[in-house]
């Protein structure tokens, strides 16, 4: 539950900061503060922070700080693109190397045949590359308000749909001792 809250908390703070705090600058500040609090809480309570969370928070701190210092919202808008590309490369390379990163993230929930983990890695990489393109199209062609609404009300449903589309692969290739 803490992991979920640490990932959704900064998004909620960003949304609230934009619509109730006065725009991208406030939203960015709220997101930065919330992200630092969340990652600190994860470390204090769980004594660990995932590599993906560290990467995500680092990119946020850099792009968010540049946004606040420069006053240019472009930097916070390209943060998702940068993260999606980084994550896409991580999942793609782990599939190519036959050492699927996604296996370590999901193995406590589902156990699959090894080739299924590799397939899931490639699909996840493709999803992240797709999301990078979508983010670029939205932020470059839409208003700040539309981009913020897309980040909250578009990305989450798209991600959920992607996960649902993976269920047939998971169910077909799960091992007998799998939890799902």
Curated annotation (Swiss-Prot):
Pfam families named among the record's database cross-references: IspA
InterPro entries: YciB
Membrane topology category: Multi-pass membrane protein
Keyword annotations: Cell inner membrane, Cell membrane, Membrane, Transmembrane, Transmembrane helix
GO CC field: plasma membrane
Ranges that cross the membrane: 4-24, 25-45, 49-69, 76-96, 118-138, 150-170
Subcellular location: Cell inner membrane
Superkingdom: Bacteria
Role noted for this protein: Plays a role in cell envelope biogenesis, maintenance of cell envelope integrity and membrane homeostasis.
Protein name per UniProt: Inner membrane-spanning protein YciB
Biological source species: Rickettsia rickettsii (strain Sheila Smith)
Gene name, Swiss-Prot/TrEMBL: yciB
């Amino acid at each position: 539950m803490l992991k979920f809250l640490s990932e959704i908390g900064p998004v909620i703070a960003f949304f609230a900061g934009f619509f109730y705090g006065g725009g991208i600058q406030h939203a960015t500040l709220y997101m930065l503060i919330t992200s630092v609090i969340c990652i600190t809480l994860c470390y204090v309570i769980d004594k660990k922070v995932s590599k993906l969370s560290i990467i995500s928070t680092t990119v946020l701190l850099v792009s968010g700080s540049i946004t606040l210092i420069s006053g240019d919202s472009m930097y916070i808008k390209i943060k998702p693109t940068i993260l999606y590309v980084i994550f896409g490369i991580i999942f793609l390379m782990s599939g190519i190397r036959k050492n699927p990163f996604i296996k370590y993230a999901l193995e406590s929930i589902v156990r699959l045949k090894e080739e299924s983990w590799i397939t899931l890695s490639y699909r996840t990489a493709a999803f992240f590359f797709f999301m990078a393109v979508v983010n670029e199209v939205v932020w470059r062609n839409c208003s700040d308000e539309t981009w913020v609404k897309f980040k909250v009300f578009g990305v989450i449903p798209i991600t959920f749909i992607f996960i649902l589309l993976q269920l047939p692969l998971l169910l077909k290739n799960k091992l007998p001792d799998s939890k799902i």
